[in-house]
A protein has these predicted regions:
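Hydrophobic alpha-helix feature that most strongly marks membrane-spanning transmembrane helices
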Residues: 44, 64, 106, 124, ...
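Residues that flank catalytic or metal-binding motifs in active/ligand-binding sites
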Residues: 14, 85, 222
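Catalytic cores of nucleophile-dependent amide-cleaving enzymes
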Residues: 1, 69, 73-162
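A domain-level signal for caspase-like cysteine endopeptidase catalytic cores
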Residues: 1-79, 116
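A structural signal for short secondary-structure junctions
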Residues: 10, 65, 106-110, 137-139, ...
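Soluble non-cytosolic domains of exported or imported proteins
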Residues: 30-34, 53, 126-127, 154-158, ...
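An often Trp-containing, charged/polar helix-loop segment at the C-terminal end
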Residues: 156-233
Length: 233
């Protein structure tokens, strides 16, 4: 079984949030810095690393030196059927391959929640069931929040920040995801007037994002891709 039943209150756990907004051969993700900063400075206790700090060496170092019960990765990802080496999560200067997840020692100390704020991280095939999410569970992670299709970084910003906000109030992962998705459906999570509006507060966005077209985050494209794999509690 990929799931280990049992409940642990995630609220005392710290989050390690890492991501990249600039890439040499892939489109930029300009909303990732806002995602990481909002999570670690307004929603949850933890540390964040952007771009140059998002390396495999630093990821391993942070996991070995500190007890992070939650790991959040915001970047590009690609799942390709076939060899596990073909599927990857993009780090700053390298790719984390599907078959390398187990080497991160996510079970010692145990990671209770892995958030993969990237494209198609819950997609799999018979050789790699549930893709990165399934591999993370096999590596010892209790639950993984991942995606079933290509997602926009604006949608990921809205969904993940609302998810952490809900998780701090109702510390059951599946219920926090349900409430976050409902908040997006109802239009309580939106980007307008250079502000990110969540269910109970708003966050000012950097001036460089002011010219970006604001999508309708209530559209299922932006919220329905996210799914929780593993322990629902």
């Amino acid at each position: 079984s990929l799931t280990e039943p049992g409940y642990r209150d995630v609220r005392p756990l710290q989050v390690l949030a890492m991501g990249a907004s600039k890439f040499t051969d892939q489109p930029p993700l300009p909303w990732v810095p806002v995602e990481l900063e909002t999570i670690t400075e307004q929603l949850w206790k933890g540390k964040s690393f952007l771009n140059e700090g998002f390396t495999l060496q630093n990821l391993r170092s942070q996991l070995s030196q500190h007890q992070f019960g939650i790991v959040h990765l915001a970047t590009h990802a690609e799942f390709k059927p076939g060899s596990p080496e073909d599927s990857y999560i993009q780090l700053w200067n390298s790719k984390l391959r599907l078959n390398e997840l187990a080497q991160l020692q996510l079970s010692d100390p145990p990671v209770d929640l892995l958030v993969l704020s990237a494209c198609r991280t819950a997609l799999g095939n018979p050789q790699a069931e549930l893709g990165f999410a399934g591999s993370a569970l096999q590596a010892g992670v209790d639950s993984t929040l991942a995606t079933l299709w290509y997602v926009s970084d604006q949608g990921a910003l809205g969904l993940t920040t609302e998810f952490y906000r809900q998780l701090s109030q109702v510390p059951i992962k599946s219920e926090a995801l349900r409430r976050a998705q409902l908040a997006m459906i109802r239009g309580n999570v939106r980007i307008a007037n250079n502000q990110l509006y969540n269910s109970d507060k708003q966050v000012s966005l950097p001036p460089e994002l002011s010219q970006t077209t604001s999508p309708n985050l209530s559209d299922p494209y932006y919220w329905a891709a996210f799914t929780l794999v593993g322990n629902p509690w």
